[in-house]
């Protein structure tokens, strides 16, 4: 699979009741999320764009409102197509599988574990990112 390019959020997990998680399409959030503040948080996360670059990096980008653009530039924000880059990490292909660096380091039974998590592709061409909690589709 070729990851290069921009990906947008298609689905995020929603918890309609304690202990139950379902993935919900962005346009259906209001059906499942009734708290206005929580809905705003979800909509903000759903506006992120993820760009997988040929140099092996993936940039998480958030839209910058036009009235905030100059201030963001003055503060040194990296701006691409009216989006501010809020995180950059690396991705790689290894043994035919795709991985990205979660930047989470740790150990299991005193042995270090990799900070890389697999990016899984679904039959419909979407991918699971952010430890599987974000479903992305090509922009």
Write out the residue ranges for each language-model feature.
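Lipid interaction determinants
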Residues: 1-139
């Amino acid at each position: 699979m070729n990851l290069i390019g921009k990906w947008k959020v298609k689905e995020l997990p929603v918890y309609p009741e304690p202990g139950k998680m379902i993935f919900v399409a962005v346009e259906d959030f209001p059906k499942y999320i009734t708290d206005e503040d929580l809905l705003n948080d979800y909509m903000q996360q759903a506006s992120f764009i993820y760009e997988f670059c040929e140099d092996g990096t993936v940039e998480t980008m958030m839209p910058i409102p036009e009235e905030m653009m100059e201030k963001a530039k003055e503060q040194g924000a990296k701006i691409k197509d009216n989006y501010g880059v809020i995180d950059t990490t690396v991705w790689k292909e290894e043994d035919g599988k795709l991985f990205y660096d979660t930047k989470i380091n740790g150990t299991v039974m005193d042995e270090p574990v990799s900070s890389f998590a697999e990016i899984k592709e679904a039959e419909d061409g979407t991918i699971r990112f952010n430890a599987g909690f974000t479903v992305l589709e090509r922009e």
